[in-house]
Regions:
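Short, polar/acidic, helix-capping and beta-turn segments at strand->helix junctions
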Residues: 3-117
Length: 117
């Protein structure tokens, strides 16, 4: 998504797809969608879905998400956004941690592990 990246968006290994961390960059503009965590989170999930779809996968293939929040006080907003995006059941496993900083001033970054079968 970010034009100056020095990494792969995703790598397949051992029947799994591992994505790099995604931030709330709109791929069409190369800009952060908002300074607010909710629009950033939605864009991150859309970016992950686009990577999955490029590999003929979908949200049901996700087995684990690692979430990095700039402020753990945004945890409830994160949960609300996940319900909107995934529905109310069958969430993937998830770890969420607070971090000191994220690329491009992002408030949330998420990476994903998805099964390829």
């Amino acid at each position: 998504v970010y034009k100056r990246q020095t990494y792969s968006q995703a790598v397949s290994a051992g029947g799994f797809l591992y994505t790099s961390g995604q931030v709330g960059i709109n791929p069409a503009t190369g800009e952060m969608v908002s300074n607010d965590v909710k629009p950033q989170c939605l864009q991150v999930l859309k970016n992950i879905l686009a990577i999955l779809e490029a590999k003929n996968l979908s949200l049901v293939n996700i087995v684990k998400l690692n979430v990095y929040l700039k402020d753990l006080n945004d945890f409830s907003i994160l949960n609300e956004t996940f319900i909107e995006f995934f529905g109310k059941t069958n969430f993937p496993a998830r770890s969420t941690v607070e971090v000191a900083g994220l690329p491009l001033g992002a408030r949330v970054e998420i990476d994903c592990i998805a099964i390829e079968s």
